[in-house]
Amino acid sequence: MSEPDSSLKKNDSKAAVFARRLASTVVLLSVVFYGLLSGGTLSVVLVGALVMLLNVIGLLEFYGMVKENQLPRFKWLGLTGGVVLLGAVFLYLSGLAAKWFGLAAPSLAGAAELEVAILAVFLIAILVRRVFAHPAPPSFSMNGNTILGVLYVSWLLGFILKIFFFKTTSETPEGAAFDGGFCLLFFILVTKCSDIGAYSLGSLIGRHKMIPK
């Protein structure tokens, strides 16, 4: 193949990658826009479902990387703990727990107490599971890798819910002009624009491949 043909094929490949990234961004942002800005019950459910989906994908990826590095972990226990943690925070902050179980109005302090309680139970569950693990791997590595996945993925994703539901918590001053949906939308737009901008600029003038074949 001649050099011009090779260069043309390379440019087509870059254009195809950029088109796929742009298309996925448009689809994702359309769903996120509706979830964050439409309001109502459907909006709350959509945001919760998206965050939980990210949570499950993130946990699977995290524990997959731990496995690739041949480190011990309780994958399914960690996945269960992460889903329970984020799910409980969603039910509490969305007001569904208060509606179903007659609890007090949601607050950030209450969410923090809930997280601490769930993490404490999760830690006990890991220690109990470790007792029955045969052959027994190092306790610190096994327990630490499992807990780290929940903290790094699920606990941090919980802050998305705290921002989104902040206006419904008891700490929010009456009449405060704060909309968690718009704040999250701003963060997402900045992140995606930075990602696409960096990719486009690197493709046009970059000299060194970040991930060479």
Model-assigned labels for residue ranges:
Residues 2-213:
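Membrane-embedded alpha-helical bundles of polytopic integral membrane proteins
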